[in-house]
């Protein structure tokens, strides 16, 4: 592989990983909008939730995430250890995720009594290149473990969202 080919590969892998890091930064910063969703996901994209339910298409992804994340005062997603494999105009991605969620009914001041939950897992994604831009076409979240308050509420929320 030539140096130019190596540089192109590094740039494309960075473009793909940026899709996830920028998307979840928008979620955590509470500035998610439909333009960010459309810049991240393809028109037929699927998000597969931990319970197996799916959101398909940018509008459904946007509405589903706005509804889901409205339950939290704050979230913080740490996404690491990206492995990206590119084959022509398709790619796969694997990364680890630690997701922190502070329930909306908490006080504004930090407290030892705050209700929260943490989830660790693995993101598995597929991406496609549309024109010159990479977009996520599928994103799954395999939760390895969870801890904290409100796990029953989370499971009930996903059941009601189906």
Indicate residue ranges for each PLM-predicted region:
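Short secondary-structure boundary micro-motifs
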Residues: 8-10, 29-31, 37-38, 66-69, ...
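A solvent-exposed, acidic/Ser-Thr-rich amphipathic alpha-helical stretch
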Residues: 33-101
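A short linear-motif detector with a strong N-terminal bias
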Residues: 3-5, 18, 25-27, 55-57, ...
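A short, hydrophobic secondary-structure junction motif
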Residues: 15, 19, 23, 42-52, ...
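A beta-strand edge to alpha-helix "cap/lid" segment located at domain peripheries
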Residues: 4, 70-81, 85-162
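Short, low-complexity N-terminal intrinsically disordered segments enriched in polar/charged residues
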Residues: 1-39
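Alpha-helical protein-protein interaction elements
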Residues: 15-16, 33, 57, 61-64, ...
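Generic, low-specificity signal for short hydrophobic/alpha-helical stretches with a mild N-terminal bias
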Residues: 2-5, 19, 43, 47, ...
């Amino acid at each position: 592989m030539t140096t130019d080919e190596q540089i192109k590969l590094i740039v494309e892998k960075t473009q793909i990983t940026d899709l996830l890091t920028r998307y979840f930064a928008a979620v955590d910063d509470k500035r998610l909008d439909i333009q960010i969703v459309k810049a991240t996901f393809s028109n037929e994209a699927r998000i597969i939730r931990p319970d197996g339910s799916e959101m398909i298409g940018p509008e459904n992804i946007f509405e589903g995430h706005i509804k889901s994340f409205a339950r939290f005062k704050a979230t913080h997603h740490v996404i690491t250890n990206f492995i990206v494999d590119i084959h022509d105009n398709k790619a796969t991605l694997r990364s680890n995720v630690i997701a922190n969620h502070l329930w909306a009914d908490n006080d504004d001041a930090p407290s030892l009594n705050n209700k929260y939950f943490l989830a660790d897992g693995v993101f598995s994604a597929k991406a496609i290149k549309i024109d010159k831009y990479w977009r996520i076409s599928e994103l799954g979240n395999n939760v390895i473990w969870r801890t904290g308050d409100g796990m029953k509420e989370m499971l009930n929320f996903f059941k009601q969202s189906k």
